[in-house]
Amino acid sequence: LAYVALDYEQELETAKSYELPDGQVITIGAER
C-alpha cells in the first residue's frame, strides 16, 4: 500500500476489489 487509510473500514466499503482468473487482484474506487 502506498498510504495508510485512517478510516480503513470506510475505505473497504468504497473500494471494489476483484480477483482475476489469473490470480491478480485489482482494486478500483479508492485508489489515490
From Swiss-Prot:
Locations listed in the record: Cytoplasm, Cytoskeleton
GO CC terms: cytoplasm; cytoskeleton
Keywords on record: ATP-binding, Cytoplasm, Cytoskeleton, Nucleotide-binding
A GO molecular function held by the record: ATP binding
Similarity annotation: Belongs to the actin family.
Chain's role: Actins are highly conserved proteins that are involved in various types of cell motility and are ubiquitously expressed in all eukaryotic cells. Essential component of cell cytoskeleton; plays an important role in cytoplasmic streaming, cell shape determination, cell division, organelle movement and extension growth.
Protein name: Actin-2
